[in-house]
Swiss-Prot record:
Residues 12-22 have a biased composition (Basic residues). Residues 1-30 are annotated as: Disordered. Belongs to the cucumovirus capsid protein family. Keywords: Acetylation, Capsid protein, Ribonucleoprotein, RNA-binding, T=3 icosahedral capsid protein, Viral nucleoprotein, Virion. The keyword Cell cycle does not apply. Transmembrane segments: none annotated. It is found in: Virion. InterPro entries: Cucumovirus_coat, Cucumovirus_coat_Asu_sf. The N-terminal arginine-rich stretch does not seem to be the major RNA-binding region that allows formation of an infectious ribonucleoprotein complex. This is Capsid protein. It comes from Cucumber mosaic virus (strain DKRD).
């Protein structure tokens, strides 16, 4: 008797067929492999632009130019009366100024994005004559000439001052490290008295690399 047409044989034949679930899992695996390959390719592409010792990050937001690094200095203005001014020349460490012919490409000023005061403060960097005593009158005249961008830093209702950086490009001027003593950071306390150490300025000078490994950010 031929049993091929029996109910049991039909059930066995059906069990031998590939299940839809298996085909779906196989398709999902293939898709996952393709996605993994895409992610690996993207990761390799991004790695090319990541900061290294030869191409460090400029203040954590932008890569330095190839062959450049940066040196940071911190300034803490003293007490500044309402409507008054403060100025201080840039003073880089001796280990940097020993290489005074190395070119400087950019200067960046950063301020804490969480201000502890509710006044409005103007900050700028300017090249000033060596004869200037950075008196209140001299700084006032510099702010008034409108020849330099100014960082307006003030209280924000959210508690966060988003506009807390100002970048100066000196590459076309061919400025060098030796020229930095001719530049000064200037501050104007517009609306209220600024207490001592109430504002901290971080000045980052991007310059050609010098042969001191400890100067390179990691």
């Amino acid at each position: 008797m031929d049993k091929s047409g029996s109910p049991n044989a039909s059930r066995t034949s059906r069990r031998r067929r590939p299940r839809r679930g298996s085909r779906s899992a196989s398709g999902a695996d293939a898709g996952l492999r393709a996605l993994t390959q895409q992610m690996l390719k993207l990761n390799r592409t991004l790695a090319i632009g990541r900061p290294t010792l030869n191409h460090p990050t400029f203040v954590g937001s932008e890569s330095c130019k190839p062959g450049y690094t940066f040196t940071s200095i911190t300034l803490k203005p003293p007490e500044i009366e309402k409507g008054s001014y403060f100025g201080r020349r840039l003073s880089l460490p001796d280990s940097v100024t020993d290489y005074d012919k190395k070119l400087v490409s950019r200067i960046q000023i950063r301020i804490n994005p969480l201000p502890k005061f509710d006044s409005t403060v103007w900050v700028t960097v300017r090249k000033v004559p060596s004869s200037s005593d950075l008196s209140v009158a001299a700084i006032s005249a510099i702010f008034g000439d409108g020849n330099s961008p100014v960082l307006v830093y003030q209280y924000a209702a959210s508690g966060v001052q988003a506009n807390n950086k100002l970048l100066y490009d000196l590459s076309e001027m061919r400025a060098d490290i030796g020229d930095m003593r001719k530049y000064a950071v200037l501050v104007y306390s517009k609306d209220d008295k600024l207490e001592k150490d109430e504002i901290v300025l971080h000045v980052d000078v991007e310059h050609q690399r010098i042969p001191i490994s400890r100067m390179l950010p990691t």
